[in-house]
Amino acid sequence: MGAGATFSRPHLFASLTTLLLLNALAPMAIQDIALRGLAVSGLNFFAISVVFPIAAYAIWAIAHNAPAAPVRRTDWAVGAIVLVMAVVPIHLAAKAALVPLSAYMLATAKRDDVTFRIGFIGAALTGALVWGALLLTAFAKPILAIDAAIVQTLTGVAVDGNVLSIGQRPGVAFDKIIILGACSSLRNISQVIILWASLVQLFEVRVTARVVAAGLLAIASTVLVNAIRISLIVAYPQHLQFIHHGIGSSLLGLVALVAAFAIIGSSILRSKRHAVA
């Protein structure tokens, strides 16, 4: 049978992974619509990072072009369990189900197999949807203190843990800035990992030291952009809303995404050229 002609093993896992991803992101979108309204939320892509649709596209592009592979009995059993976790009215269940599903795909497929590639992206998704939140819950103080230390290096302000002391400023009602979990670089790092994994698997690039180094450089770039964003708030606290919530925040987010995409993309292009040569 031709590629993508029948519902095969890759299609099953692409469907399950996408279902879990949609269930995990839906509450975020619904909350943003309730907060901003449908029109404004839509313009803001419902507060969902573009790396998630990129990951979904990569998963389905990989599955669509895959040779037919029969679904195993254990695949159906795993699929049934995942499906139950996806539909139960517990928000965290859909996110948590990505962990065993991705682990199962990685464990039951060879490294060059389509199912392994989908599982690789699924594992990357768990970083943003599962492990990032757990890490912040368990190690919030040291993680946020690292962000604060980077900002201190850029601005020279006094720092106490995750608290930046900016002093009294004319027209500003606060003299301290607290870095919370939503402002942590960890969130951006997890999204860069998703972008890296999606592009690497979509273009079938071998995970070499050079490709990993490009991913680490992309992570460093997004950490720097996040630190610059917070540093701008320190320098111009009177423009907090613009920098932290408004167009300024969106523009800096775009800069971080473009930088990461450029770094990862150039690495993939070099790898493909070397493979052809």
What is the predicted function of each stretch?
Residues 1-277:
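Hydrophobic N-terminal alpha-helices or hydrophobic patches in metabolic proteins across all domains
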